Amino acid sequence: MFGEGSRDNVALSKEGLFDKLEIGIASDITIRDKWSCGEIKKPETINYRTFKPEKGGLFCEKIFGPTKDWECCCGKYKKIKHKGIVCDRCGVEVTLSKVRRERMAHIELAVLIVHIWFFKTTPSRIGNVLGMTASDLERIIYYEEYVVIDPGKTDLNKKQLLNDAQYREVIEKWGKDSFVAKMGGEAIYDLLKSEDLQSLLKELKDRLRKTKSQQARMKLAKRLKIIEGFVSSSNHAEWMVLKSVPVVPPDLRPLVPLDGGRFATSDLNDLYRRVINRNNRLKAILRLKTPEVIVRNEKRMLQEAVDALFDNGRHGHPVMGAGNRPLKSLSEMLKGKNGRFRQNLLGKRVDYSGRSVIIVGPELKFNQCGLPKEMALELFEPFIIKRLKDQGSVYTIRSAKKMIQRGAPEVWDVLEEIIKGHPVLLNRAPTLHRLGIQAFEPVLIEGKAIRVHPLVCAAFNADFDGDQMAVHVPLSIEAQLEAKVLMMAPDNIFLPSSGKPVATPSKDMTLGIYYLMADPTYFPEDHGGKIKIFKDVTEVLRALYSGGFLDEHTDGRRDETGRGIHIHEKIKVRIDGQVIETTPGRVLFNRIVPKELGFQNYSMPSKRISELILQCYKKVGLEATVRFLDDLKDLGFIQATKAAISMGLKDVKIPEIKSEILKEAYDKVAIVKKQYDDGIITDGERHSKTISIWTEVSELLSDALYVEISKQTKSKHNPLFLMIDSGARGNKSQLKQLGALRGLMAKPNGAIIESPITSNFREGLTVLEYSISSHGARKGLADTALKTADSGYLTRRLVDVAQDVIITEKDCGTLNHIEITAIRQGSEELLPLKDRIYGRTVSEDIYQPGDKSKLLAENGDVITSAQAELIDDAGIESIKIRSTLTCESRRGVCAKCYGLNLANGRLIGLGEAVGIIAAQSIGEPGTQLTMRTFHLGGIAATSSTPEIVTNCDGILVYIDLRVVVGQDGNHLVLNKKGAIHVVRDEGRSLEEYKKLLSTKSIESLETYPVELGVKILVGDGEKVTAGQRIAEVELHNIPIICDKPGFVKYEDLVEGISTEKVANKNTGLVELIVKQHRGELHPQIAIYSDPGLTELVGTYAIPSGAIVSVEENQKVDPGMLLARLPRGAIKTKDITGGLPRVAELVEARKPEDAADIAKIDGVVDFKGIQKNKRILVVRDEITGMEEEHLIPLTKHLIVQRGDHVMKGQQLTDGLVVPHEILEICGVRELQKYLVNEVQEVYRLQGVDINDKHVEIIVRQMLQKVRITDPGDTTLLFGEEVNKKEFYEENKRTEEEGGKPAQAVPVLLGITKASLGTESFISAASFQDTTRVLTDAACSSKTDYLLGFKENVIMGHMIPGGTGFDTHKRIKQYLEKEQEELVFDFVSESECAC
């Protein structure tokens, strides 16, 4: 293959770089005349005594150039003065030895050889061109059968295969010269050469037009695409067969002599030697007129040797080297993590870098890091040498180096001078997001460890337990400038993923600040005194320090002068003309708070500190915020030291009610066990109920313990409470294990062990309890190791799919939008609207509801936090915003559709790599979460809410609910989709409320989605009050409820076939269970109005696994339970389930046991059973149109006969297939579904990611369309093309008066989308390297080097950040006009790399 950079009509930059790269198949002339510097005839490498290359061998100096600079092989010519002379004795050109890295050679083959990539890589290119199967080709290429090339006078067909016997038979019958049949590479070459591709293309297009079968059309379209590639490019099909093999330059496959006469060599040399040996042997036996059988065998062996060289192991067994290890062929050199692309081109080792252990540097400023002197000396050596020479201290580099080694005093002075204003980059692996590399001003320190500012640890995810960091020195002025302007730690205090501060105090700092700001615990009135009043802050501080610093430990005693005040004493102080009741601690804290934020007079847990930092940035800007952060750090550490908080065993209180609650729980469990023994419930239900009881106990004791330790004694805080409440360390779950009970444990498979650990760590665990708990704890550790790799791979795929999404323009001018609402679960608002719309561009004018004169946001505005608050307060439910999903930029996305850059709160700049930021934002928490599972030590985290309690007064309204009144007078829900709303009591009728709710004319105060089997305790339209129980949820079973009175008749409940009677092991009671069966049976319970069973009033399908609760002929009333389907055993939910779910969504995989969804709006009906599947029909009542669904009997239906369903609504349990949503509901619904589902996984873990990042990934998954009708365009049926390409081709066709193509959108998984990228270099470096390169070469693809990866690989500057086109043009212009202005401009640039 060849690649060439086109320089035609291209304005080259001063480096002379090319702007595009083309790949194609190399012809024999190219290999011989353009690439090769000579033919290799011998397999020898180097002489074992002299270590000099053998002449004509694989390392020949005559062909590849000299091994020593400016010296020929025989030594006749030495030194540079003979440059360019070719030695007349040895034939070696006198030049630099580095030409041995560039010069290639070739091996002249004795017989034509087929290139394995074009024949064996699927789809087989040769097979497609010739219209032959891969197995037929294999038999021809490996000399097993002949193929007819020209039938001549015979009755044979062209391309017919003949074995030896048939071949001899034809010769006997027709004579040797009457036809042409060959085998091996020669046969393939002749066939390819004789193929008229132009007429073949025409023929295929005709066939494609006439064929009606979808499968045949797809097959033809694939072949057509390959043929079209050859026709439209300069490639010839016969070039896929080789006449000569190119040989890689010798310095790229080195041979190094080791001690003891052995050699270390590249595997390629062994593979080349095999080819040369077999080739020479074949040449020799061809000269000797050897029997055909031997020649054929030798030819096959040569073909196999060349196959092994190109792709070892692709055909047959791989060739083994020493130690029975497969040799690495040319393909392996490119593939995988250690291949050329990923090892040498995308990731390079860096000079001017160091690495050391990190320790905390609390004395540092935010923009500083402590650099060990010895390390700095080594890193900045060239700079020191230059400065020493400039000063005249030394005159040569050697003497300067000696001076540095001696450690002369002037060297240290020079070093101090040099590092002023020269930033260094610190990096901690793994670099999961862009905050993993930041720039700092170095400060020289003694010792050997790097010192790091405590506040940047969160960004690096670093701690001081032996972590190491790497230091890199930016060398060029541009690099230093970018580091200073864009990468300094103070510029990176917010997370690009959510806009939340990342540089927030933690651990001791939080504790110190929280302690200082704690609520008053010393009240003078309790000690017979009065509240002290101070005229200003200075007086408070004087009293605080002059009278001795009093706190918990001094027990509130005064010194002799009586002047001391307690740090948590209740005092009054005049601030800005107002008398405020506060504590001296809070006064002390407010000294460092910027005036604009006002007086902070409340406790300060970590969450509130974070909010304060954000507020500070918005009000006073970055510089003041960084100063504030540094002050926070200092104050936090000082106060934590002074507070001297420590934890004693007695601080862990055990709730007094523990024994009582445990006794109750054991009684409840005993009742459940008895129910099971009596056969009322199944074993599964017993397990579920037991777990629910213990979960409730766990939560109850946890809350009781928290209340207990939070009770403040007169002048004492519980240190444990301080640590947890401040957010410094620990959480409620850990506290529960210390003082209440460890609770339920999980087995390694995620199932919960029924018997909980009722002891806590203060009491100590029994041996049995300890062994149970070690189960789950070990799972956590094992998961961490395994899942980190998965998460890293997910991040890599995300980066690959989104890497070329760059901000390319300010505004694309689109009118498209998406609609956004707050995210709710029941009545609880999980994510308010203001958080979702902040930083997004609105695509319509937004007015105050009911007041058109008050404009809240104008079309095209980027919503600020103040506007977001206003919109949310106005009670607006949904808003139309612009999104990257609807952006119409030709390449990348526009700034308006993206919105604010969350890392700095400004509109995103041109050239910003938003795709990579999105991938990092989604990938980084994945890794964090996988690492976080074990902190709970396998605690079972189950969710159970057995009742619904309303939080407000109002009227209860049922919407979309089918209910039946049960025997107890309560309402039982019969359908899956519906909700109960609580609305404000405005004295309207129930019908009015329902109508207003359905048209969204009024807002409900609370909404609770309810499902099948929920018992509603309040009637439709009745009044409710806050705190009232309004519904009960059945957690353990999915009930099947009767809604009409009558008599039971079993239908298709045939014992032994569709049902079985199972005797309970413990009770001996017999239960009727519906089982999975293969017969044409439809198990259901029919209800008849009379005992004679003549008039049918209703039927109820019973899914397999359900337990029938009624007898045949039994009289039933509405609300009675007919059968129950036990829910699966509860498993713990952690990101272990979450990460694969994210991967499943972004890879667009079909979920296991997927749900069926309705294809049209209509009413549900059943039509019996067919082949173990239930036939469910959705009928449109207006048009009468029907859609049939075949649903396996094992699946649980969540709709019933007569239910109204909407298009896209689930009919059965399970996860929805995203491709079906696309097909049925369209692109918008799919986008919404994917974004919400991905967010759901992260939200469960408490991880905040902005929607815009997920939207970018989803955008990349929907970049392609599939052609359904090519019209008059050049597109092919079934071809998947980029939307941009599709629209451009249609536009061109319409302009020419042709018929445009029709297409449907396609959802691709991120791996497939990455491989389908326009850049073949980027795709090849990701996965499937050989297939991607073969594909690109066959159709002579051109890579225009528009993305990041391809530019990194080619060694160009990336087209993003300061390398973005617009910025580069300005820079070049400035260089011409006024060179000194370049740097001013770049520093003002708002772009970020």
From Swiss-Prot:
Keyword Transferase attached: yes
Cofactor descriptive note: Binds 1 Mg(2+) ion per subunit.
Entry cofactors: Mg(2+); Zn(2+)
Keywords: DNA-directed RNA polymerase, Magnesium, Metal-binding, Nucleotidyltransferase, Transcription, Transferase, Zinc
Pfam families: RNA_pol_Rpb1_1 (PF04997), RNA_pol_Rpb1_2 (PF00623), RNA_pol_Rpb1_3 (PF04983), RNA_pol_Rpb1_4 (PF05000), RNA_pol_Rpb1_5 (PF04998)
Keyword Transcription: yes
Enzyme class, spelled out: transferase
Database matches in InterPro entries: DNA-dir_RpoC_beta_prime (IPR045867), DNA-dir_RpoC_beta_prime_bact (IPR012754), RNA_pol_asu (IPR000722), RNA_pol_N (IPR006592), RNA_pol_Rpb1_1 (IPR007080), RNA_pol_Rpb1_3 (IPR007066), RNA_pol_Rpb1_3_sf (IPR042102), RNA_pol_Rpb1_4 (IPR007083)
Coiled coil: none
GO cellular component: DNA-directed RNA polymerase complex
Signal sequence, start to end: none
EC number: 2.7.7.6
Residues binding Zn(2+) 1: 72, 74, 87, 90
Residues noted as binding Zn(2+) 2 in the record, renumbered to the chain: 812, 887, 894, 897
BP GO terms, sorted: DNA-templated transcription
UniProt binding sites for Mg(2+): 463, 465, 467
Gene Ontology MF term list: DNA binding; DNA-directed RNA polymerase activity; magnesium ion binding; zinc ion binding
Reaction it catalyzes: RNA(n) + a ribonucleoside 5'-triphosphate = RNA(n+1) + diphosphate
Family under the similarity heading: Belongs to the RNA polymerase beta' chain family.
Oligomer status and interactors: The RNAP catalytic core consists of 2 alpha, 1 beta, 1 beta' and 1 omega subunit. When a sigma factor is associated with the core the holoenzyme is formed, which can initiate transcription.
Known role: DNA-dependent RNA polymerase catalyzes the transcription of DNA into RNA using the four ribonucleoside triphosphates as substrates.
Name this polypeptide is given: DNA-directed RNA polymerase subunit beta'
Provenance organism: Chlamydia abortus (strain DSM 27085 / S26/3) (Chlamydophila abortus)
Taxonomic classification: Bacteria, Pseudomonadati, Chlamydiota, Chlamydiia, Chlamydiales
Gene: rpoC
